[in-house]
From Swiss-Prot:
UniProt comment concerning the protein's domains: The fibronectin type-III domain mediates interaction with COPS5 and RYBP.
Key word Transcription regulation present: no
Domain Fibronectin type-III: 11-108
Gene3D superfamilies listed in its UniProt record: Ankyrin repeat-containing domain, Immunoglobulins
GO biological process: one example: positive regulation of DNA-binding transcription factor activity
Entry keyword set: ANK repeat, Cell projection, Cytoplasm, Cytoskeleton, Nucleus, Repeat, Ubl conjugation
Protein name: Fibronectin type 3 and ankyrin repeat domains 1 protein
Localisation: Nucleus; Cytoplasm, Cytosol; Cytoplasm, Cytoskeleton, Cilium basal body; Cell projection, Cilium
Induction remarks: Expression is activated by FOXJ1.
Subunit structure: Interacts with COPS5; regulates the phosphorylation of JUN and the transcriptional activity of AP-1. Interacts with RYBP; may prevent the ubiquitin-mediated proteasomal degradation of FANK1.
Gene giving rise to this polypeptide: Fank1
Entry keyword Cytoplasm: yes
InterPro entries: Ankyrin_rpt (IPR002110), Ankyrin_rpt-contain_sf (IPR036770), FN3_dom (IPR003961), FN3_sf (IPR036116), Ig-like_fold (IPR013783)
ANK repeat residues: 109-139, 143-172, 176-205, 209-238, 243-273, 277-306
Length: 344
């Protein structure tokens, strides 16, 4: 039987570079030898890929085996890497290939870059990303907000205009049902509010709690925005579909702002309107201990004698919840009221 013929190793070619991304490099090599493989594996040539450590100026093995392809992963974008191939014969003889240098690509633009540009008000980066066309303009961030919602909430008027001119949908809603107009109204960004209205945003839209932009503006407490909204046609006594509350009710419940309440009342808000439980703005203000708002509502004609659906009036509510200052106001008001004639 003829002994196994040992062929002396020649210097191998450097690895061939295949697909390169921002985080991986494909290398393959010695395709001719693969065709000639015969016999048991221990008689095959063994391959190792070594990568240079640029700080130590030395090479470390990142792959060894009999395959003729390897994908190096976990790399940094836009970085130069150096590799060499080591070929070892069954007898232990080995040779190194020349070094091959490969640079990873730039990291592709993702929705994260897009949202980051909006979040930090980077107009130039936003324009570059939009011009590249790699990102869907209405893709939400991890909180369910579109870029327009973020820009509207932060008051970045120029970014709002860029996004709208590039086709963003002004009426999209986040997970709680709020649209960009509601967010801008709450945050008090009048320029953004006006621009969104000119480009199709609606006062009639409601969030999941049934609230409109005017409810959110009342919560935000920005009088200049509320004043403009009413002049633009907002219904001042619009009722939410949850509790049956008007914006004035929201003020009584949330902030107790006299300024906002005065503005709403001057625009025609009904001080004696009732919610689904028969509560009036005065009752809600009493329950939340908004003393100055209680005084304002009384001055503006709020009826202190009405009862809710359960037969409770404001005096009883103030006593039960120990609202002493509010109780004093109500009792003072009661003293000044003309006594109604009653039949005993």
């Amino acid at each position: 039987m003829e002994p196994h013929k040992v062929v002396p190793l020649s210097k191998p070619h450097p690895p061939v570079v295949g697909k390169v991304t921002h985080h991986s490099i494909e290398l393959y090599w010695d395709l001719e030898q693969k065709e000639k493989r015969q016999g048991p594996q221990e008689q095959w040539l063994r391959f190792s890929i070594e990568e240079e450590d640029p700080k130590m100026h030395s090479y470390g093995v990142i792959y060894t085996g009999y395959a003729t392809r390897h994908v190096v992963e976990g790399l940094e974008p836009r970085t130069l890497y150096k590799f060499r191939l080591k070929v070892t014969s069954p007898s232990g003889e080995y040779e190194y290939s020349p070094v091959v240098s490969v640079a990873t690509t730039r990291e592709p633009i993702s929705s994260e870059h897009f949202h980051r540009a909006v979040s930090v008000n980077d107009e130039d980066l936003l324009l570059r990303i939009l011009e590249g066309g790699h990102v869907m303009i209405d893709v939400p961030n991890k909180f369910g907000f579109t870029a327009l919602m973020v820009a509207a909430q932060k008051g970045y008027t120029r970014l709002v205009k860029i996004l709208v001119s590039n086709g963003t949908d002004v009426n999209l809603k986040n997970g709680s049902g709020k649209d960009s107009l509601m967010l801008a109204c709450y945050a008090g960004h009048l320029d953004v509010v006006k621009y969104l209205r000119r480009h199709g945003a609606s006062w009639e839209a409601r969030d999941l709690g049934g609230c409109t932009a005017l409810h959110w503006a009342a919560d935000g407490g920005h009088c200049s925005v509320i004043d403009w909204m009413i002049k633009d046609g907002c219904e001042v006594d619009v009722v939410d579909t949850g509790s049956g509350w008007t914006p004035l009710m929201r003020v009584s419940a949330v902030t107790g702002s006299q300024k906002v309440a005065s503005l709403l009342i001057e625009a025609g808000a009904d001080v004696n309107i009732k919610d689904k439980d028969g509560k009036t703005p005065l009752m809600v203000a009493v329950l939340n201990n908004h003393e100055q708002l209680v005084q304002l509502l009384l001055d503006k004609g709020a009826d202190a004698t009405v009862k809710n659906e359960f037969g409770k009036g404001v005096l009883e509510m103030a006593r039960v919840f120990d609202r002493q200052n509010v109780l004093s106001l109500l009792e003072e008001k009661k003293k000044k009221m003309p006594r109604k004639s009653s039949v005993h």
